[in-house]
Amino acid sequence: MTVKTETAAGASTLTYSKMRGMVALLIAFMKQRRMGLNDFIQKIATNSSYACKPSEVQSILNISPPQEPELLNENSSPPPSPSQQINLGPSSNPHAKPSDFQFLKIIGKGSFGKVLLARHQADEKFYAVKVLQKKAILKKKEEKHIMSERNVLLKNVKHPFLVGLHFSFQTTSRLYFILDYINGGELFYHLQRERCFLEPRARFYAAEIASALGYLHSLNIVYRDLKPENILLDSQGHIVLTDFGLCKENIEPNGTTSTFCGTPEYLAPEVLHKQPYDRTVDWWCLGAVLYEMLYGLPPFYSRNTAEMYDNILNKPLQLKPNITNSARNLLEGLLQKDRTKRIGAKNDFMEIKNHIFFSPINWDDLINKKITPPFNPNVSGPSDLQHFDPEFTEEPVPNSIGQSPDSILITASIKEAAEAFMGFSYAPPMESYL
């Protein structure tokens, strides 16, 4: 079977075998994207078939799972059970409990739990509820990251392109984040369907993403995990960033950090080199996402992860001629391997904002959502789940998620020396409910 396709250069022949190869490439790409970075790297590192790879790349692959110094448990004894470790103290929202909600559908999954569509029994509003298993968090010593995510969420209420936290609470076994419900679908989902976007649409999304990143940077927060899976579209088509588990707080304008974390396709060269890095890693990721929106795959993508890492470190950026000069210039600046020469290295978001590629954007109108999005997800209401993966929505909701007998609710009377999730529960000031 042969298919004829017309291109700017004329007619070309696309064989069936080539089509199968392209499909296989995309399927492999999507599967790898769903795998956790640590687990994936460990699988690669222990695979003898990579023994002959360049030493530079091999040194990257042969690492143990990264941990921040502050995440290391100084006490070598087994951790207490979750119920013993928690102390809510003077909880701001002592009355919130799982049975306040009707849990309707599973709409996502992560390393430590699920995200569910839920309706509050009292006000009948819809929320996305992120439910995390304490046991899994404590086992991997990720409690500081979870608390960091909560802290970042509390600061998001002032920005239109960051998902907001309404309140949080916990039981002996689970943590509950009550978040904005966003049902326009992941950017990843829409890229899967459409392969790539026209430049005006990509510019609109990149501008809203850059605005959100700039706001986080103004709070001395580095996002570190920008990728299409973490970028949602709301019901009107505006961008909403979510998943702040890898955010790093307290990074001053000239400050650095060194934790090896992120998603393979979007790791900046300095992260792969295991060098100290700064907030410019977010601008590298913005460049990678913009490239993917325009071309359909990340800039240095390969099915072979070792080869992809080598590409990120050493291969020159290749740009096809079907984009404008301003887009080309921005991509070259964002995907600059030397972070000191990267766009954003000197004046952070202001450099991105003032780039000629964004000259059609009125930034005041953008932040006030006065610009009509180039794409409308056309959702009929909160119960419209057309943009969620059926793999999630068709799974039954566990009954235990919505159960909250008095005996398992954490109260302020529980006091232990090791307080892993102290202060997790949160409720906004009373006037926020009015």
From Swiss-Prot:
Limits of the Protein kinase domain: 101-358
Residues annotated as catalytic: D225
Cited Pfam families: Pkinase, Pkinase_C
UniProt keyword Oxidoreductase, yes or no: no
Primary location recorded for the protein, binned into one broad class: cytoplasm
Top-level taxonomic group: Eukaryota
Region (Disordered) residue spans: 66-94
GO molecular function terms noted in the UniProt entry: ATP binding; protein serine kinase activity; protein serine/threonine kinase activity
Record-level GO cellular component terms: cytoplasm; endoplasmic reticulum; nucleus
Top EC category: transferase
Induction of the gene: Up-regulated by aldosterone and glucocorticoids.
Residues that hold ATP according to the record: I107, G108, K109, G110, S111, F112, G113, K114, V115, K130
Biased composition range(s): Polar residues: 84-94
UniProt keyword Heme, yes or no: no
EC number(s) per entry: 2.7.11.1
GO biological process: apoptotic process
Similarity annotation: Belongs to the protein kinase superfamily. AGC Ser/Thr protein kinase family.
Name of the protein this chain belongs to: Serine/threonine-protein kinase Sgk1-A
Gene transcribed to yield this protein: sgk1-a
